Amino acid sequence: MYMSLNNYKIETERICKQKGWTNAAIDTVWLLLTEEIGELASAIRQHERTYKKTGLKKQRGTDVMMEMGDVFSYLFQLSSMLNIDLDKMWVEHGKKLKFKKYNLR
């Protein structure tokens, strides 16, 4: 079953309105997104045991999922602020991927 990406955007709009976050500037939300991407990277490194932080206040087990949720939340918020139709974006992105080649190890 396919869930519309726009539904997640609408839900994020509702939460932002409820929390009073609708007046945030696009550049502020962008900076918050990049901060969360860094936190996701750190959580992935912890999960993959690339490095180990000491003195943590909480267990790192669910951090990847939670940080990824934060990243998606800010992406949905930006898509709302920029009036992006996420379902259309995903279809167009899929078309682009058909021809894109990566040399990944």
Give names to the regions the model predicted:
Residues 1-68, 72-105:
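Flexible "arm" and connector segments at domain edges
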